[in-house]
Amino acid sequence: MESFVAMKVVCITVLFVIVAVNESATSEARTSSAAKETKKKNVTLHFPSYIRNPQKLALELLEICKNNKSRNSLPSTNYSAINDKYVDFKNCTFLCKHAEDRNVTLDLPPNTLCGPNGETCAEKSKCVGHIPGC
């Protein structure tokens, strides 16, 4: 009987932890202005497995893309986009799209992981990019 009660306590504790983690992630996403503007939720990003939080990186790159548009005085359209297929972890660059015919290649932030052993874009020569099958 004691083990049954203990099992219930463990299950309830696990449930609370799952709810707390989910709530924490939800509120963090709400605070990001880029996240508020993202129309799709539950997007699957195809980044290498060493990228621990793909959605956070994608939102950061989208913000860099938007800031680049305003710095370069491009026409004020609300369109800025990135595509996970055009993020080059080997060269630490990504493609930023401002309109149908206006693309620019930008640098990934220096602290972006670019290899499975903690390599970052701060030292591009050590980057290994995407490892097939991983």
Swiss-Prot record:
Q: Where in the cell is it found?
A: Secreted
Short name of one Pfam family for this protein?
A: Salp15
GO CC terms on record?
extracellular region
Keyword Secreted carried by entry: yes
Q: In which tissues is it expressed?
A: Expressed in salivary glands. Detected in fed adult female.
Q: Which residues are glycosylated?
A: 22, 91, 103
Q: Which InterPro entries match?
A: Salp15
Primary location group: secreted
The question of whether Glycoprotein is a record keyword is answered with: yes
Q: What induces it?
A: By feeding. By the presence of Borrelia burgdorferi.
Segments carrying the region annotation (Required for Borrelia OspC-binding) are 48-67
Task: Describe the subunit structure.
Answer: Monomer. Interacts with host CD4. Interacts with host DC-SIGN (CD209).
Query: What protein family does this chain belong to?
Result: Belongs to the salp15 family.
List the protein's name.
Answer: Salivary protein 15 Iric-1
